[in-house]
């Protein structure tokens, strides 16, 4: 906004200067009890927040559009703007109005952005809130993520933009920073909170210097990240952005970690979506894996569990330690005593971040005090059980002196804000107690003065009051105002009363106001000093919060295992998945009837199962439960099965269901083929691959050919551990032609025209698809079902003839080259016979006995 500031009022000139420094974001400009917005900001905020758009006088000869929000309710408005992906610069008055000449000095004290907020009211409690920078150089893609609410700082390098897209989908970022010349901007479509940043923010030397200054180091070698140069460029950008928005030191960001894909079982975007890990296909959180597993008692534990679910690990030693702890907590019956203690710890992780940023509120400190008070009892209940658990407890530490400090310093239930006063406890500071005593004595003094003045003047309506504008006053009703003594100085005239001041009251007012002001100022100083006293042990408290989060997750998983009858899985270094009595962890919780448990057996000699069976028979549920059980094992959880042995896995792929991608202009079939191509390129012999109904979106010949070729590729080329569900019965001949392939089917029983789904997995191929029976269940008209039966009988006859003619082992009608001419099929709506016409013409209520007898003979004749 280029303006000639000389044409504007001094206040608007000040506003425009501040706005020029923050051109792309909303500016909340503090004026008294309101944050005001002007010009285009006002129009935008009025639309987004549904607040009134008004005008404020004129500046440079033009009316000024204006909108505002009360300062005491600003958090709610900020929360809405942040949820919409907007950023806001908060501009406060920092000068003293009493001494200012011209506009009070103001400056932007912080910038609230979706990815860097730390205020409790602006954050999703049980979900990570991340800002990330992405960068590409010479074909290498990188992402650096920062959690401002915990200080967690991670970098990753990725081989291609598809891997980056999958990572973005996993992280569900609140804000994404990218360079102006980023080469793959198309993958950012449909994301909000996008911020284009200048290229210089991604320069390597600048990034390394910035990171070293932040961590107080000379080199990044100690973090093991020095060779990840592309990722360091991204890290420099995101750290610069954090410093720019927070306008304060960031002591809780004290390390950086390089995440390697080789450390995790990789899940692509389609797999996360299809398995409904933390979000269901409708976009909600109900009936997801997280909804079943997450009964954590702390928000920070809940967030950690979701990270585990989205990023299962391959470190078997670490997994076995998690299993040991879960096992021990169950056997030693420590779940029940630990969970209430952990619940009282609350969100210690985010409270510590606000302490580091010096934005913690009084109630944050009381919650921290409560959290620290739980630590001795938590340690007592968790230690001396296993070496793994002892190592975790050792991180919790002893903070008894900090707990004692907060106990002395903060009252039991403080007000929400320090500016309201009354936060620091009595006895903590002698000077503060003196000022408070002076201020508190005002009530008694004023009562005595009021009684004395009434008696001296004889005015029974006289009373002493106070307001923020005029201070203390003596009020007399209009009917008795003529009795006011000469030394009473009129201060204000009201409709029914006069207000006066006397020298004694004015002197006392100055003294009391000074005491209140001094009390509030000293209290704010003491409160700020508390941060200084907490800061030396911030790093240790962060480690404790991490350990408590993990203990919460493991205690939660122990409770889930106990409540839901889960078993401890075992791991094998060999390829394979061997599950007995496996159950779908989500479906079994929502079914009213008992869930039918099923086995699966895959290994190097039996690595592809062709899964057949009717629609609604449970094929998709069966395949998903195998993936979910495997994933649960790789986060360290117990699993819903009678027993489970899981071999080495590097990736889990799913190709289940599809719909049009309208935003990208891709059809259902194109989406399906894109996902399939990704699997065929990326899958290895250690990948678990689930394919459901590939090839449905095109012609029958094309679909069957593609399904056959994909199955053959997976069986022969990649030899991945694969479940391949299909309605193409031609594929059931694959086991006779390829090594390592077997048939299984979901059982069903047909009785007359109805079908009963048994939901049990049996060896061998299904005998038929039961498609017509399922169609009848869905309410398809009976005449349509009858016509379909006729068509089916004809096609099956042709298929049989083709097999006999060509001795074709696959010999299905779909590969027959000589389909005969289709015979005449009965029309959908048949013509009425003479008998039916005669019967329809009879009205029984109108017939005499003789006419009825004649009609009966006529109908009998027509039948003959």
UniProtKB/Swiss-Prot annotation:
Record keywords: ATP-binding, DNA damage, DNA repair, DNA-binding, Nucleotide-binding
Keyword DNA-binding listed: yes
A molecular function GO annotation: damaged DNA binding
Statement: the UniProt record of this protein carries the keyword ATP-binding: yes
Binding site for ATP: 613-620
UniProt superkingdom: Bacteria
Cellular component annotations (GO), alphabetically ordered: cytosol
InterPro entries linked to this entry: DNA_mismatch_repair_MutS, DNA_mismatch_repair_MutS-lik_N, DNA_mismatch_repair_MutS/MSH, DNA_mismatch_repair_MutS_C, DNA_mismatch_repair_MutS_clamp, DNA_mismatch_repair_MutS_core, DNA_mismatch_repair_MutS_N, DNA_mismatch_repair_MutS_sf
One protein family per Pfam: MutS_V
UniProt record, GO biological process: mismatch repair
CDD domains found in the cross-reference section: ABC_MutS1
Disulfide cysteine pairs (residue numbers): none
Family classification: Belongs to the DNA mismatch repair MutS family.
Described purpose of this protein according to its UniProt entry: This protein is involved in the repair of mismatches in DNA. It is possible that it carries out the mismatch recognition step. This protein has a weak ATPase activity.
NCBIfam families reported for this sequence: mutS1, PRK05399.1
PANTHER family: DNA MISMATCH REPAIR PROTEIN MSH1, MITOCHONDRIAL, DNA MISMATCH REPAIR PROTEIN MUTS FAMILY MEMBER
HAMAP family to which the protein is assigned, alphabetical: MutS
Protein name as catalogued: DNA mismatch repair protein MutS
